[in-house]
């Protein structure tokens, strides 16, 4: 196999004393092998592959640009190495299978633009356009485990809204309006998932410990939570009351849009800071304050202080 990546990941930060600048003038493109360290990912390839198409890599390895090497002869490129193997395969073969997920296609597109691989840039852009054209439907995953939920949220480049509803968790009878309010929460979730399709990841959870609870996530962490249930007393008997805090749910959904990526560059930190968003404030905090911020979640429990006075609601 012409290109291979080392399994061990090394640091991309190399001391200045261990590096030197060299030029590849006068080399034989057909036979020379090159060792590349791309952001800590190690690759072997040939000069023929690197100079086959008119890209930035051809400029680097045909003598038009100087390259940086370490003491062991690895050529250092200060980029993420995740998709560099795909770049090499495209340079060698002129075609390559694209990733399935939109996020990975966008990542590959950014690398192709950096290395000036115009053909791959066009293929990535066409693939993204096709996804917009042929995948207009709304996908709402129903999680099967907490591990699956964590993976979904951690790997998504979108803010997320999760509705947990699980009637089987209730130990008591419901108040008279609870069934209607439970249905209203579910219907609102469906409406929001259609309204913000493509911008927000919506998740259903029917295995959790709560009866009805909304959770809102940004940049992979929980930002807010709205719990819609409480326990009330009616003639010395406990009952479960389900509320429908429509305005609060709309408010938290709009708040979570502040964490939406802008043109693939992440959320607008200036906007987050101006509106009090946590991510926008993070660069002003020391390590302890940052840890406290990450652990802090805005939790709203919908419960009226006069519940005992409304025994038969």
From Swiss-Prot:
Keywords assigned: Acetylation, Nucleus, Phosphoprotein, Ubl conjugation pathway
Q: Which GO terms describe its biological process?
A: negative regulation of Rho protein signal transduction; proteasome-mediated ubiquitin-dependent protein catabolic process; protein homooligomerization; protein ubiquitination; ubiquitin-dependent protein catabolic process
Q: What is this protein called?
A: BTB/POZ domain-containing adapter for CUL3-mediated RhoA degradation protein 3
Record-listed Phosphoserine modification sites: 23
Signal peptide range in chain numbering = none
Say yes or no: keyword S-adenosyl-L-methionine present: no
> Main localisation, per the record?
nucleus
Q: Which InterPro entries match?
A: BACURD1-3 (IPR045068), BTB/POZ_dom (IPR000210), SKP1/BTB/POZ_sf (IPR011333), T1-type_BTB (IPR003131)
Motif (PCNA-binding) spans which residues? 239-245
Q: Which domain of life is it from?
A: Eukaryota
- Keyword match Phosphoprotein: yes
Q: In which pathway does it act?
A: Protein modification; protein ubiquitination
